[in-house]
Amino acid sequence: MKKPIGKILWRGLGPLLIAIILVAALMLVPFKFGRSSQATIRQAASSMSANVLKGETIKNEAMAENYVPFIGSSELSRMDAFHPSVLAQKYHRDYRPFLMGMAGSQSLTHFLSINALTHVEGKKAVMVLSPQWFVPGGVRKAQFDYFYSPAQMTTFLLHANPNSEADRFAARRLLQFPSTDSDRTVNEALKNIAAGQKLSDGQYWYLKQVKDPMADHQDALFSRLFLNNNQPQLDKAAKTLPSTYDVDDLDGLATRMGMQETTNNPFELKNDFYTKRVKRNMPKLKGSQATWSYVKSPEYSDLQLVLNTFAKKHMEVLFVIPPINAKWAAFTGLDLGMIQNTVTKMKYQLKTQGFNHVLDLSQDGAQPYFMEDTIHIGWRGWLKMDQTVRPFLKTTKAAPVHYKLNDQFYTKHWQQQSANGLD
């Protein structure tokens, strides 16, 4: 006797349908996940994991406590004994850095991430601005798409103001990336904002009632998983430091550590970096950067989105501009005059709008053991940076800030402007 078709289909498809229904319920039904443990937050703060950068839950839990955003890219991963996270831990500072960034994260990613932060209003942050972000083509599509966060995009759209030039520019810029094509409603909502129109009722309902809770639940479920655990590395580094914070003593120690770890090359690059990343490529790297320039780039307008977000949240921010390893620049032909023009343009954009806390280290690239490799701060560089970070974060509450935002920084004219006359 043949079994009914319905029973056969149910046996085959029933479990799948039940699984789909359960997952949908898990994502859509409103309920609260438990708060992350202190150990998880501490691990996340130094993990530099993509799911933490793309998420909101753990970062916002940390911001409600004594964590301070340290925003940047790959330089934050150079965790020697003088890294900000190590110094804060060893010397029992009243703050703990929460590292927001990894290789490839640039201004547009940070704009969405900072925009979604809560508990940062009226507080301080530190942001490392690398000249290398400001390439002629701007952030690569693959880089941005890797860090794309549906949760952060939903937060932006639900609060976007179509009358704001900043939000209209952000929408136009975001539409240039393939990741924003993945959800038709999100794409159409971006087009509305870009055109100066508010979201339709249907778009708002979908984002608020479907997309937002689903993204929040996914974030709460998965942002705590697969965290890199850099805490043992920080603990080990902290043990190498003296118990008393004395700048001269620490500078001597940083010099000795740098000397011990840069013995196999003439550029003062860390030994393993030189061996793994540079040595076999030396012939083709010589003179390879002679035509590079960071003066003209869409990144300047992406940076303006970050500045606008800091201003909206009344945050006081210390910007750090790192140097280039001078010996390496001489070998590759990188024009350090061009670097100074880039820095001039960056500082003009910051300071004319009231972002006056700028630590310019760009001329320190020839200092011994200042850099860990070609473009990343190390040993003595971290220590010099700490001489400004430490007093800046004596209190994590922002002083009253009065920014004077200028929409000209969203224009192509500014993106392509030279640094002449900006001093």
Swiss-Prot record:
Extracellular side: 34-423
Disulphides: none
Keyword hit for Membrane: yes
Gene Ontology terms: biological process: lipoteichoic acid biosynthetic process
Membrane-spanning parts: 13-33
A Pfam family reported for this protein in Swiss-Prot or TrEMBL: DltD
Membrane topology value: Single-pass type II membrane protein
Keywords per UniProt: Cell membrane, Membrane, Signal-anchor, Transmembrane, Transmembrane helix
Transmembrane found in the keyword field: yes
Pathway membership, UniProt: Cell wall biogenesis; lipoteichoic acid biosynthesis
Cytoplasmic compartment residues: 1-12
GO cellular component, one term: plasma membrane
InterPro entries from the UniProt entry: DltD, LTA_DltD
Annotated compartments: Cell membrane
Family recorded in the similarity comment: Belongs to the DltD family.
Described purpose of this protein according to its UniProt entry: Involved in the D-alanylation of lipoteichoic acid (LTA). Could be responsible for the transfer of DltC-carried D-alanyl groups to cell membrane phosphatidylglycerol (PG), or alternatively of D-alanine residues from D-Ala-undecaprenol phosphate to the poly(glycerophosphate) chains of LTA. D-alanylation of LTA plays an important role in modulating the properties of the cell wall in Gram-positive bacteria, influencing the net charge of the cell wall.
NCBIfam families: LTA_DltD
Entry protein name: Protein DltD
Gene encoding the protein: dltD
